[in-house]
């Protein structure tokens, strides 16, 4: 009996001796994973993030029928009834993500640089200088729709970063794409000027002039060399969006949407109250 107890004690101590280091190693690994979090310096590429967004959008569209009806789904169904020919929002979102993914690959492959070198003087592009004005005016209309889509996408992507890192030729192309050679101005009236004077203005890009004073003065006879001396004036448009400027049909649609929104909100709040009443009664009975 004594020998058997001694053997059992030795066996238990031997197992404890073997299990002890294993427990320490496992505990050490858990502590390392808990308190040590290495910093990942590598950022996932934008194409991979876009693929993930596309996959999530597709999964969300397939599982949307399993989720309870929300307020946004109710409003989308209402608009689908009002506009039967309207496109599906989920399909538009997925196609938009695929388009962004394709444009990201084109931008990462350096296609924008190829376009700029092809149409806008490679020497000025490599030296980080401004594009010649005549070359910009002549070759910008030659850009295709795919080239303009890539340029718009590059502008939206690069404007999120540090603008000091942008090249001068890209900034010039950005400005010309957004405003043209007339600059950020509105409501230019060309009817009161002669064709020769109008053609002279169109041949002078990036100049400062007061077109409103010229169009009010029918006897104005200004040489192209004197155009740069005309005072620059910014014209502010006083037109604003007001309720009175909306047509009756749009007012009816907006009023209907507001009415349906209020009705859905009241219905949801009533359902929530009916769910809370049984819970309160059960708590009172339990007490």
UniProtKB/Swiss-Prot annotation:
Q: Which UniProt keywords apply?
A: Membrane, Mitochondrion, Transit peptide, Transmembrane, Transmembrane helix
Q: Where is the transit peptide?
A: 1-24
Report the locations given in the UniProt record: Mitochondrion membrane
Question: Gene Ontology cellular component?
Answer: mitochondrial membrane
Q: Where, by residue number, does the polypeptide cross the bilayer?
A: 250-266
Where is this protein chiefly located?
A: mitochondrion
Note whether Membrane occurs among the keywords: yes
Question: Which membrane topology term applies here?
Answer: Single-pass membrane protein
Top-level taxon of origin:
Eukaryota
Q: What family does the entry list?
A: Belongs to the GEP7 family.
**What the protein does?**
Involved in respiratory growth and required for cell survival in the absence of prohibitins or GEM1.
**Name of the protein in its database record:** Genetic interactor of prohibitin 7, mitochondrial
| Native source organism of the sequence | Saccharomyces cerevisiae (strain YJM789)
